[in-house]
């Protein structure tokens, strides 16, 4: 029986940066922390200068002849590089259109689930297509569907801007939201705003309380 292949479960070896004593070239072209060219000097001389400045000697161009090093604060340099990489990744995010579907008779719990989904999509930088689906004769209730979508836009106003108001699309009613680009300016207190909101959300079925008996 052939032996079973073994998998190396060890963590991959991280490539260490070429700084200070890890630089093995005898001659280096060195640039000081302020951008001044120190010319071609020996590795030991370059390390002495870096130590005097209480900074690091960092290899920035290994393919040059001789290799180029710069004297700098490597910790700060690494932080700035990681920050730039994160910003570039954020800018390269491809905006997608995510869809949130519901019925016009959606109950309160499911409605909050849809709100949570929309918030996650918006925070990721995506647009949200809010869709109310009609079945059969439910198409007669477009006014309730529009009211539901406007309520949703209101509840998401801190995270979203309406890019396309509610409109009919076949047997559905849709609305498009995009991530809010400017902070929301509220004209009314939060409690007053909430008190004015109304939503045609179906209540879960339950027993109707019996009227109190007259004395």
Swiss-Prot record:
Keyword Cell wall biogenesis/degradation (UniProt): no
Record region (Disordered): 159-215
Positions with biased composition (Basic and acidic residues): 184-197
Gene Ontology cellular component annotations, sorted alphabetically: cytosol; membrane
Alphabetical list of Gene3D superfamilies matching this protein: Translation initiation factor 3 (IF-3), C-terminal domain, Translation initiation factor 3 (IF-3), N-terminal domain
GO MF term list: ribosome binding; translation initiation factor activity
InterPro entries, per database record: T_IF-3_C_sf (IPR036788), T_IF-3_N_sf (IPR036787), Translation_initiation_fac3_CS (IPR019813), Translation_initiation_fac_3 (IPR001288), Translation_initiation_fac_3_C (IPR019815), Translation_initiation_fac_3_N (IPR019814)
Pfam family, one: IF3_C
Single biological process term from Gene Ontology: ribosome disassembly
Keywords, sorted A to Z: Cytoplasm, Initiation factor, Protein biosynthesis
Composition bias type Low complexity, residue spans: 200-215
Cell compartments where the protein resides: Cytoplasm
Keyword Protein biosynthesis: yes
Family that this chain belongs to: Belongs to the IF-3 family.
Protein task: IF-3 binds to the 30S ribosomal subunit and shifts the equilibrium between 70S ribosomes and their 50S and 30S subunits in favor of the free subunits, thus enhancing the availability of 30S subunits on which protein synthesis initiation begins.
Alphabetical list of HAMAP family matching this protein: IF_3
Quaternary structure, from the entry: Monomer.
PANTHER family: TRANSLATION INITIATION FACTOR IF-3, TRANSLATION INITIATION FACTOR IF-3, MITOCHONDRIAL
Protein name (Swiss-Prot/TrEMBL): Translation initiation factor IF-3
Species assigned in the record: Synechococcus sp. (strain RCC307)
């Amino acid at each position: 029986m052939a032996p079973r292949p073994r998998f190396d479960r060890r963590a991959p070896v991280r490539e260490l940066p070429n700084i200070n004593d890890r630089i093995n070239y005898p001659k280096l072209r060195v640039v000081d922390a302020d951008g001044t060219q120190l010319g071609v000097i020996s590795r030991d001389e370059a390390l002495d200068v870096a130590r005097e400045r209480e900074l690091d000697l960092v290899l920035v161009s290994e393919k040059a002849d001789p290799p180029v090093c710069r004297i700098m604060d490597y910790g700060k340099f690494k932080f700035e590089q990681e920050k730039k990489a994160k910003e570039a990744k954020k800018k390269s995010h491809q905006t997608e259109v995510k869809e949130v579907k519901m019925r016009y008779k959606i109950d309160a719990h499911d409605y909050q689930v849809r709100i949570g989904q929309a918030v996650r999509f918006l925070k990721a930088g995506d647009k949200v297509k809010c869709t109310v689906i009609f079945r059969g004769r439910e198409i007669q209730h477009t006014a309730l569907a529009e009211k539901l979508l406007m309520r949703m836009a209101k509840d998401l106003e801190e995270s979203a801007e309406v890019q396309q108001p509610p409109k009919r699309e076949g047997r559905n009613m849709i609305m498009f939201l995009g991530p809010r680009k400017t902070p929301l300016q509220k004209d009314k207190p939060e409690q007053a705003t909430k008190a004015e909101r109304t939503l045609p959300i179906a209540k879960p079925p339950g027993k109707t309380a019996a009227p109190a008996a007259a004395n």
